């Protein structure tokens, strides 16, 4: 089959997960389209080269703030269309929960969009302090999470300053504190209740909804809240009904089911006399990380318009049936707003190729297990391949046991491995996925016979959800996509941890245990992109092996194509050591003391001192200069 652009797109499932923001150009480069398919196309290798020329180093996080605005616009347009179709007059506000990515370059860009169609959500005191500064005058702020009196006072101060803050009651004890602090500050609070739905979405994040959810009020607790407020000056302050169906909901039916239950709460609260002006449906809108358009955990079987319609329709019908004023619909779809806007670029530092397998020459003292393996290899064209592979596995295991017991030496142990790999490659060539009986063995061989691509990054820092919850992220070389990828490899990071390996890859509208990659060329960089990493990954990343934040640049669209709008240096080694309690002055003193005690010349002492200082203040990651 002739390699082509279309085949590159198909191999890496790009058109299914990219959602119109990424594609391959004629030069074989991955390109980004921050304004969607009709906008400017920016070559990722060119951006990386420009950033490196400006001093940035790999691994490098590329942020495209224009994608944030474009995603927000698509979300608002989808709800505008759904409300038009269902003749719903309540309006819509897209709220960004900053826990998804609190960086100023993300939350600030989104907050710069004016109008009633955007708001912010905070789930902690530090987040609330950020949101109070980011929000526009009169802007909607949803205050979620655990609350103490200070949190509540800060939210109420926001209302006194002209912000539309709503304190969502998630625990029965919070209401009393809110009313007491409101009285002290002489302000009418904006109140909401978070109802705990029984409906439960499937997937990795299902515990954020359902009866066992961490947050939310039971039906009895909701009634108790209303009982306290009813007939008081605060009764008209209860304006928000909030709930959460889950995060990254894969199946649109789960959304429909959750909305049916939530709509009943809205109707009942309204019939009791509560003036619910906002229904906050929480998050749930998923991203198709896999590009499989399915109900699997890291995919979705619906589009943005279908999501909006399934939110609007139940509320529209309920308002018509019960003659209720349509409430403003609020969503907290932070993942959908931010995932596409960030790409991590890292260079491959080395490849450990899978042994091709060779048939060693016969020696006089050859153990029986080696002779058996040699006989199996000689029968590859004469006997069923699967039968031969199982025999090879048996004798390979027998050989390992014999070596452990001291019955064979290292030379013969190596010969057994050579023959086993030669047999494995020969068996794989004789199997086909078209034959159902071949598939289990072929899958096992494809998983075993892969190269290890060592990449200059940390799984735990840059894509921690891969380690924590087996999250899928699309991974694609950003160059040479006009060439056939002749190798299959797994991506391994720099950490001293076997978990620092990516185990599943997006390929051909499915998932596989390895990724099609290219052979490295001497003196030439080979760079890989990790896509859809804009939600949660920066914030959740940890410092395993003291690998810290990577360098990052913001790439903005302008009249000439693009410009590097902002560059942020990543953590240096001294920053990481200070973070874990090392006194840097003491570290430097010890270095100097040991150099002085080594009895070297002044010139050599200075050279070593300079190298130690450079190591202390340098980037924790490896050099991004390709090896000659």
From Swiss-Prot:
**Pathway membership:** Amine and polyamine biosynthesis; agmatine biosynthesis; agmatine from L-arginine: step 1/1
Specify which residues bind substrate according to the UniProt entry for this protein: 279-289
Secretion signal, residue range per the UniProt entry = none
Pfam families associated with the record:
Arg_decarb_HB (PF17810), Arg_decarbox_C (PF17944), Orn_Arg_deC_N (PF02784)
Q: Does the keyword Membrane apply?
A: no
Answer yes or no on keyword Metal-binding.
Answer: yes
GO MF term set: arginine decarboxylase activity; metal ion binding
Positions carrying N6-(pyridoxal phosphate)lysine: 99
Its EC top class is lyase
> According to the lineage, what is the superkingdom?
Bacteria
Enzyme Commission identifier(s)? 4.1.1.19
Query: Biological process GO terms, please?
Result: arginine catabolic process; putrescine biosynthetic process from arginine; spermidine biosynthetic process
Cofactor list: Mg(2+); pyridoxal 5'-phosphate
Q: Which UniProt keywords apply?
A: Decarboxylase, Lyase, Magnesium, Metal-binding, Polyamine biosynthesis, Pyridoxal phosphate, Spermidine biosynthesis
Catalyzed reaction equations = L-arginine + H(+) = agmatine + CO2
Q: Which PANTHER family match?
A: ARGININE DECARBOXYLASE (PTHR43295), BIOSYNTHETIC ARGININE DECARBOXYLASE (PTHR43295:SF9)
Entry-linked NCBIfam families: PRK05354.1 (NF003763), speA (TIGR01273)
Give the protein's biological function. Answer: Catalyzes the biosynthesis of agmatine from arginine.
Q: Which family does it belong to?
A: Belongs to the Orn/Lys/Arg decarboxylase class-II family. SpeA subfamily.
What name goes with this protein?
A: Biosynthetic arginine decarboxylase
Q: What is the species of this protein?
A: Xylella fastidiosa (strain M23)
């Amino acid at each position: 089959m002739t390699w082509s652009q279309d085949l590159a797109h198909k191999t890496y499932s790009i058109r299914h997960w990219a959602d119109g923001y990424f594609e391959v150009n004629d030069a074989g480069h991955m390109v980004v389209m921050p304004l969607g398919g009709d906008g400017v196309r920016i070559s990722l290798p060119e951006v990386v080269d420009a950033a490196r020329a400006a001093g940035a180093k790999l691994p490098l996080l590329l942020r495209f703030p224009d994608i944030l605005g474009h995603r927000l616009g698509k979300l608002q347009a989808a709800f505008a269309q759904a409300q038009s179709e269902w003749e719903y007059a309540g309006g819509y506000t897209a709220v960004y929960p900053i826990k998804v990515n609190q960086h100023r370059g993300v939350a600030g860009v989104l907050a710069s969009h004016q109008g009633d169609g955007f708001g912010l959500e905070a789930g902690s005191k530090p987040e609330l302090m950020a949101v109070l500064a980011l929000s526009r005058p009169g802007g909607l702020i949803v205050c979620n999470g655990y609350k103490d009196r200070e949190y509540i006072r800060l939210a109420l101060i926001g209302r006194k300053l002209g912000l539309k803050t709503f304190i969502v009651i998630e625990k029965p004890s919070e209401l009393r504190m809110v009313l007491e602090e409101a009285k002290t500050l002489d302000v009418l609070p904006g109140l909401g209740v978070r109802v705990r739905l029984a409906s439960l979405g499937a997937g990795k994040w299902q515990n954020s909804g359902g009866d066992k959810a961490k947050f939310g009020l039971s039906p009895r607790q909701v009634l108790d809240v209303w009982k306290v407020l009813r007939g008081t000056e605060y009764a008209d302050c209860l304006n928000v009904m909030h709930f959460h169906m889950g995060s990254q909901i894969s199946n649109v039916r789960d959304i429909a089911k959750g909305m049916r239950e939530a709509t009943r709460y809205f109707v009942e609260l309204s019939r009791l006399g509560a003036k619910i002006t906002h229904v906050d449906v929480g998050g749930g809108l998923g991203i198709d990380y896999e590009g499989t358009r399915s109900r699997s955990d890291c995919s979705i079987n619906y589009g943005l318009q279908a999501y909006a319609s399934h939110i609007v329709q139940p509320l529209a019908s309920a308002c018509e049936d019960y003659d209720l004023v349509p409430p403003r619909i609020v969503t907290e779809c932070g993942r959908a707003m931010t995932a596409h806007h960030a790409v991590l670029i890292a260079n491959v530092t080395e490849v450990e190729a899978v042994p091709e397998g060779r048939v060693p020459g016969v020696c006089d003292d050859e153990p029986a297990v080696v002779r058996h393996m040699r006989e199996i290899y000689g029968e590859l064209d004469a006997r069923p391949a699967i039968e031969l592979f199982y025999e090879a596995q048996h004798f390979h295991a027998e050989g390992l046991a014999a070596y452990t017991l001291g019955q064979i030496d290292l030379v013969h142990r190596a010969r057994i491995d050579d023959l086993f790999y030669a047999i494995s490659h020969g068996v794989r060539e004789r199997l086909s996925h078209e034959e159902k009986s071949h598939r289990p063995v072929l899958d096992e061989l494809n998983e075993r016979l892969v190269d290890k691509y060592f990449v200059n990054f940390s799984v735990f820092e840059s894509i921690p959800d891969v380690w924590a919850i087996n999250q899928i992220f699309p991974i694609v070389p950003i160059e040479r996509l006009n060439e056939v990828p002749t190798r299959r490899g797994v991506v391994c990071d720099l950490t001293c941890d076997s978990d620092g390996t990516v185990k599943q890859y997006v390929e051909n509208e499915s998932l596989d245990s390895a990724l099609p990659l290219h052979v490295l060329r001497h003196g030439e960089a080979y760079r890989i992109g990790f896509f859809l990493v804009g939600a949660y990954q920066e914030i959740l990343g940890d410092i395993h092996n003291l690998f810290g934040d990577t360098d990052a640049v913001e790439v903005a669209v302008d009249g000439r194509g693009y410009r590097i709008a902002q560059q942020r240096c990543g953590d240096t080694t001294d920053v990481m050591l200070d973070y874990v309690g090392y006194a840097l002055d003491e570290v430097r003193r010890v270095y100097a003391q040991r150099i002085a005690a080594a009895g070297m010349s002044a010139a050599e002492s200075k050279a070593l001192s300079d190298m130690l200082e450079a190591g202390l203040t340098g980037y924790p990651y490896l050099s991004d200069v390709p090896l000659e």
